[in-house]
């Protein structure tokens, strides 16, 4: 009798994706982040579901309902902090996953890569709307500032902002719709993640060398299931260390003050994972220019496959490109730091230089480095 795993219509899909999947034998721990992102997503949906059972999306009670979750609901505090810090872990894994793709040339799988860029944008949108829900000072002013950026769009901008707000300012209608979108988007992300996997399994995984590995494949289970479990345990350990010891380390103290439209916080800034994009936005002294730079800072990822000039796929054997990659990482860390600083000298000029460097490295220096390496190897 044939194994049910290979014949049952549903089990067959699971089998081909997670059990009998032919996988390169040499993929490193950088390939763990896909499964970690899946775990983060499931964790966020579960904790979010339990939070939604007690949360009220009304401006008068939203802040109190979050306080109520932390004080009165059984284990509400741990659910709330797992959800808040889970978002941080999600973005750490996302950045590592994208970085891995850039370093090892995984972006040459065009459909998989573009699907990933869409997933990144949707996750960012979800996280932004989730940050508004506790209705603290930073929630309110973050929502006001970021949605207001759309008013920079010529002709339709103002109408668009008022349409998103559901009124003439961020108010009850805004909070309610943000809650609705924040609830539905993760399920859309799950569906898109499945499409992402579908595209990946059409081509098979890349590997650190960037060389086709069809001659040396091993089954996903047990080799990579056990490896993913190790990664998952490290992820959960890190998350729980954050949650149980320093739950507010990555948050903003201003968000423990209820939203007040009459009092602007001295420094409006988003969560740490948006600071690099926020720094790029602020570095341009023109509203529309800033918004375009903000969009481009993420959408530039979709251009990367077309900027690949090297004859080799991976950066494993390309030292000049490696230098460029780590320069980009250092630049992003600089931008993240600048995004959290006030708009004053010398932070303004550092932010502007770091923003120029960001686009320069991706659009000019990396393709140039690849061409130089091709010539050095007489290719």
Curated annotation (Swiss-Prot):
InterPro entries: Cyt_b/b6_C, Cyt_b/b6_C_sf, Cyt_b/b6_N, Cytb/b6-like_sf, Cytochrome_b, Cytochrome_b_C_euk/bac, Cytochrome_b_N_euk/bac, Di-haem_cyt_TM. GO terms for biological process: mitochondrial electron transport, ubiquinol to cytochrome c. Heme b b566 binds at residues 97, 196. It is found in: Mitochondrion inner membrane. Keywords: Electron transport, Heme, Iron, Membrane, Metal-binding, Mitochondrion, Mitochondrion inner membrane, Respiratory chain, Transmembrane, Transmembrane helix, Transport, Ubiquinone. GO terms for cellular component: mitochondrial inner membrane; respiratory chain complex III. The chain crosses the membrane at residues 33-53, 77-98, 113-133, 178-198, 226-246, 288-308, 320-340, 347-367. Its cofactor is heme b. The keyword Lyase does not apply. GO terms for molecular function: metal ion binding; ubiquinol-cytochrome-c reductase activity. A ubiquinone binds at residue 201. SUPFAM superfamilies: a domain/subunit of cytochrome bc1 complex (Ubiquinol-cytochrome c reductase) (SSF81648), Transmembrane di-heme cytochromes (SSF81342). Heme b b562 binds at residues 83, 182. Binds 2 heme b groups non-covalently. PROSITE patterns: CYTB_CTER (PS51003), CYTB_NTER (PS51002). It comes from the Eukaryota. It is a multi-pass membrane protein. The cytochrome bc1 complex contains 11 subunits: 3 respiratory subunits (MT-CYB, CYC1 and UQCRFS1), 2 core proteins (UQCRC1 and UQCRC2) and 6 low-molecular weight proteins (UQCRH/QCR6, UQCRB/QCR7, UQCRQ/QCR8, UQCR10/QCR9, UQCR11/QCR10 and a cleavage product of UQCRFS1). This cytochrome bc1 complex then forms a dimer. Heme 1 (or BL or b562) is low-potential and absorbs at about 562 nm, and heme 2 (or BH or b566) is high-potential and absorbs at about 566 nm. Belongs to the cytochrome b family. Component of the ubiquinol-cytochrome c reductase complex (complex III or cytochrome b-c1 complex) that is part of the mitochondrial respiratory chain. The b-c1 complex mediates electron transfer from ubiquinol to cytochrome c. Contributes to the generation of a proton gradient across the mitochondrial membrane that is then used for ATP synthesis. This is Cytochrome b. It comes from Ovibos moschatus (Muskox). The lineage of its organism: Eukaryota, Metazoa, Chordata, Craniata, Vertebrata. The gene is MT-CYB.
């Amino acid at each position: 009798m044939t194994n049910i795993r290979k014949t049952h219509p549903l089990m067959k899909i699971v089998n081909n994706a997670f059990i009998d999947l032919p996988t390169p034998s040499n993929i490193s721990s950088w390939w763990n982040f896909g499964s970690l992102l899946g775990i983060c997503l499931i964790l966020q949906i579960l904790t979010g579901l339990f939070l939604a059972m007690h949360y009220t999306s009304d401006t008068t009670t939203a802040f109190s309902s979050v306080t109520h979750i932390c004080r009165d609901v059984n284990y509400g505090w741990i659910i709330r902090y797992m959800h808040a810090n889970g978002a941080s872990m999600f973005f750490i894994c996302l950045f590592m996953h994208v970085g891995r793709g850039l370093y090892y040339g995984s972006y040459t799988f065009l459909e998989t890569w573009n699907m990933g860029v869409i997933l990144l944008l949707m996750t960012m949108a979800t996280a932004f709307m989730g940050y508004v829900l506790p209705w603290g000072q930073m929630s309110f002013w973050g929502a006001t500032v970021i949605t207001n950026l759309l008013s920079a769009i010529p002709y339709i901008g103002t109408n668009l902002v008022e349409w998103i707000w559901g009124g003439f300012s961020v108010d009850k209608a805004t909070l309610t719709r943000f809650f609705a979108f924040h609830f539905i988007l993760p399920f859309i992300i799950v569906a898109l993640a499945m499409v992402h996997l579908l595209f990946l399994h059409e081509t098979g995984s890349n590997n650190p060398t960037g060389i086709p590995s069809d001659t040396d494949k091993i089954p996903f289970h047990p080799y990579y299931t056990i490896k993913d479990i190790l990664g998952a345990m490290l992820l959960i350990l890190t998350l729980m260390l954050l949650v149980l010891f320093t739950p507010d380390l990555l948050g903003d103290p201003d968000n423990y003050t209820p939203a007040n439209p009459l009092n602007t916080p001295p420094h409006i800034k988003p969560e740490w994972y948006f600071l690099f994009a926020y720094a790029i936005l602020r570095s341009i002294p023109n509203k529309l220019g800033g918004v375009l730079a903000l969009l481009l800072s993420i959408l530039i990822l979709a251009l990367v496959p077309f900027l690949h000039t090297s004859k080799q796929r991976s950066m494993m054997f390309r030292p000049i490109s490696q230098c460029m990659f780590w320069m980009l990482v250092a630049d992003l860390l600089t931008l993240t730091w600048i995004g959290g600083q006030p708009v004053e000298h010398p932070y303004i000029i550092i932010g502007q230089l770091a923003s120029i460097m960001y686009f320069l490295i991706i659009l000019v220096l990396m393709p140039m480095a690849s061409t130089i390496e091709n010539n050095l190897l007489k290719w």
